[in-house]
From Swiss-Prot:
UniProt key word Lipid metabolism: no
Signal peptide: none
Protein name from the UniProt record: Eukaryotic translation initiation factor 4E-1A-binding protein homolog
Entries under Pfam families matching the protein: eIF_4EBP
Chain spans, region Disordered: 49-103
Classification lineage: Eukaryota, Amoebozoa, Evosea, Eumycetozoa, Dictyostelia
Cellular component, GO annotation: cytoplasm
Species, as recorded: Dictyostelium discoideum (Social amoeba)
Role, per record: Regulates assembly of the eIF4F complex.
UniProt keyword list: Protein synthesis inhibitor, Translation regulation
Stretches with biased composition (Low complexity): 76-92
The keyword Iron is assigned to this record: no
Taxonomy, superkingdom: Eukaryota
């Protein structure tokens, strides 16, 4: 069973930044599914100082190499001329009788 407790947070010094806060000043976030996650001050400070927050993502080197390869491929290819797509104009009805037939 989950428990709820209020932890007041003073945001007077950072009033220019719009955090998701409740009326009592508690910081929270929501997931795409609509679950509300409430963060207390101690947990946020622990997350900021955790070793995981100070390490880069493991796939960062792969992403960087992939982006570099794309840039190299773009610079070595010859530019091709493209023609704009042609569209056929639809004939406009001559009057409203064609659009709304009355019986």
């Amino acid at each position: 069973m989950s428990t709820t407790r209020a932890i007041p947070v003073s945001l007077k010094d950072r009033s220019d930044i719009d955090f998701s806060t409740s009326l009592g000043g508690t910081l929270y976030g929501t997931t795409p599914g609509g679950t509300k996650i409430v963060y207390d001050r101690n947990a946020l400070l622990q997350y900021r100082n955790s070793p995981l927050s100070k390490t880069p993502p493991p796939q960062l080197a792969h992403i960087t190499n992939t982006e570099l390869n794309k840039k190299v491929e773009k610079s070595t290819t010859t530019p091709t001329t493209t023609t704009p797509p042609t569209t056929t104009a639809k004939p406009k009805p001559t009057n409203d009788d064609d659009i709304f037939p009355m019986e």
